[in-house]
A protein has these predicted regions:
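N-terminal leader/targeting and accessory segments in enzymes
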Residues: 1-98, 102
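Phosphate-binding loop of NTP-binding sites
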Residues: 2, 6, 67-68, 77-221, ...
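Cofactor-binding loop segments of dinucleotide-utilizing enzymes, especially the Rossmann-like FAD-
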Residues: 14, 40, 117, 143, ...
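Short, hydrophobic beta-strand segments that form beta-sheet elements in well-ordered domains
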Residues: 35-39, 217-220, 242-243
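Short polybasic amphipathic segments
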Residues: 253-255, 259-266
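A short, charged helix-loop
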Residues: 269-271
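Conserved small/polar residues in nucleotide/adenosyl-binding loops
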Residues: 275-282
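Cationic, low-complexity basic patches in intrinsically disordered or flexible, solvent-exposed regions
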Residues: 285
Length: 286
């Protein structure tokens, strides 16, 4: 469901991304006609929330019992989708989502989204660097630095966002559609938020849900944690680039042959020169 031209906004949580969403909304009264922030059960006023209140936002502190009706609810990533607070937001808003999903719906950029239990920040930095080196307008966002919402204004159509996304953030997406999505690895993590390892893994894999055959899913096929969930990854119409040290089958792959990295896209191989990389660095460059 697209965002309305004008909508009322509910924000759950007063962490950085939640306050940044509220700040963006207040700066865009042509889009957002009311901003309400529920800070959470232990929340209290602070300098940042007072400044937003002075600018026109309404804050409710010390409770997770939401009242009222809203067009859009944006939740902070620390609020589990299985929590009573999240449920309250969903019951009182026509749509609920996390900050990356909200920013995606407002942006005109191409997105590259990178997730995994380990290695996200390094891979995001490398990807952003390579795009810039190729002359593309790119910005790294998400867990690596600024929330995407802080970077969407003033950008030309079809520039690039390189987003480092956690399982929390992906779990609260529905329409996020990266042009490229990277899954580095899966090991058990954040079980308190997701309630099970399977939920955690499927939240990561949810990143691929809206991708089509002219997008590119990049997966480390030698990671045992990823391999456990192959049935959810290899679905019809999904184009997958298999990453491995040993050469994998398929038209799309990245691997090492005779000491050089090889990238194969749609059957066409391109050697990528590199020297003096340690094993873990090679993995991240792949």
């Amino acid at each position: 469901m697209p965002l309305a031209d004008v909508f009322s906004l509910l924000v759950l949580g007063q962490g950085k991304s939640g306050l940044d969403v509220a700040r963006w909304a207040l700066a865009h009264p042509e889009r957002v006609n009311a901003v309400t922030v529920y800070g959470g059960g232990t929340s209290e006023p602070n300098d940042a929330t007072r400044a937003l209140e002075a600018a026109g936002a309404s804050f409710v502190y010390g409770t997770e019992q939401v009242e009222g009706a809203y067009d859009v609810c944006v939740t902070c990533p620390g609020i589990s989708e299985f929590s009573g607070f999240f449920k309250a937001g969903r019951e009182h808003a026509a749509q609920i989502m996390g900050e990356p999903e909200f920013a995606y719906r407002l942006s005109t950029d191409n997105w590259i989204a990178i997730t995994g239990t380990n290695g996200k920040t390094t891979t995001t930095s490398l990807t952003d660097y390579l795009l810039k080196a190729a002359g593309e307008a790119s910005v790294a966002v998400g867990n690596i630095g600024e929330p995407p919402i802080n970077e969407i204004d003033g950008r030309a159509h079809n520039e690039w966002f390189v987003a480092e996304l956690s399982s929390y953030q992906i779990a609260t997406t529905t329409e996020l559609h990266p042009r490229v999505a990277v899954l580095l690895n899966i090991t058990p993590d954040h079980l308190g938020w997701h309630k099970s390892h399977k939920n955690y893994a499927l939240a990561k894999i949810k990143l691929f849900d809206n991708m089509v055959d002219d997008d590119l899913v990049v997966v480390d096929v030698e990671d045992a944690g990823i391999h456990e969930f192959d049935e959810y990854i290899y679905t019809p119409g999904r184009r997958i680039c298999k990453v491995a040290f040993d050469e994998p089958e398929g038209e799309d792959a990245a691997f090492v042959r005779d000491g050089k990295m090889i990238v194969r896209l749609k059957g066409v191989e391109t050697p990528v020169s590199y020297t003096h990389l340690r094993a873990h660095e090679t993995d991240q460059y792949l």
